[in-house]
Amino acid sequence: MFVDRVIIELIAGKGGNGVVAWRREKYIPKGGPAGGNGGRGGSVILEADTQISSLDWFRHRRILKAQSGGDGGGNCRQGKNGTDLILKVPCGTLLKDAKSGKVIHDFVEDKERFVLCKGGRGGRGNDSFKTPTHQAPNICTEGTLGEIHHIELELKLIADVGLVGFPNAGKSTLISSLAGLRVKVAAYPFTTLQPNLGFIELDNYKRIYIADIPGIIEGASHNRGLGLEFLRHIERTKLLIFILDASGIDGRTPSHDFRILREEIGAYNPELLERPYLVVLNKIDTEDSPSHIQEFEKNFSISSDMLFKISAVYGEGLQELIEKMTQRLSQKKEIEY
């Protein structure tokens, strides 16, 4: 199951307690203090991992604790430090304060680490209180509590290309053809109920990562349909591809769909309208596609190097689209997230 938002409580380990102990050796009746300090509590550390694509692991784990430190011992033995709790999250995860919504950290790079909750300090044993004027202290201190944070993890997919379109526009078929993914494809709305992330392997060992988000409908920016839950997944993409159904399904036209898609994306985040984009007219193998394509070209002045006519089912026009995607991505400087 794809999970892209969770709220959890993270608790660092408590420091171990210091102890009161005395040297007990033969012929040394007053051996002096020998109580050791407590160990440090384990910290909670989050680490980005490219091998993870969802927050599903956290779905039924709402409270997570690091190990507490061990208590000190006699003969000045220090307690064992608690083991740090290292939690793996996907690249593209935002770490937020659950109450205020403030972003604490943004995980972008693989193996990137962030210490969120520091473990508690170990308490002092009576040996540490010994001074020249106080040779037999009979006191010790407890370890301090570890830090606690109530946080929200929110995943925004990191991809080179984001596919944007109405339900049934053919996004899943296109990403299946381009990236070889086995995604659910059928002729009814919202077949894609979660984002799909695939990649195209290029000849120079480079990859183009493609994100297919569930279909956008009118009112998505106001959380209609699947709405805001998935619109955020296109925020990190470097290139948008608008997939338009040229067959005129459900009485809609490519002109209508393109206008609504631009309006919804602009209402959600106006900066996305400044993102480089390509327009793809899909299903050119259908009977009514020529008239709808002609109408679209009349309504919108889109240059020929940004407009592609394809059949995702039959693979027509896909090679030209891949070449243009590669070219546009090589021209575009990396976006600051």
UniProtKB/Swiss-Prot annotation:
Its EC number is 3.6.5.-. PROSITE patterns: G_OBG, OBG. It comes from the Bacteria. Transmembrane segments: none annotated. Residues 159-330 form the OBG-type G domain. Keywords: Cytoplasm, GTP-binding, Hydrolase, Magnesium, Metal-binding, Nucleotide-binding. Residues 1-158 form the Obg domain. It is an enzyme of class 3 (hydrolase). NCBIfam families: Obg_CgtA (TIGR02729), PRK12297.1 (NF008955), PRK12299.1 (NF008956), small_GTP (TIGR00231). Belongs to the TRAFAC class OBG-HflX-like GTPase superfamily. OBG GTPase family. This is GTPase Obg. It comes from Protochlamydia amoebophila (strain UWE25). The gene is obg.
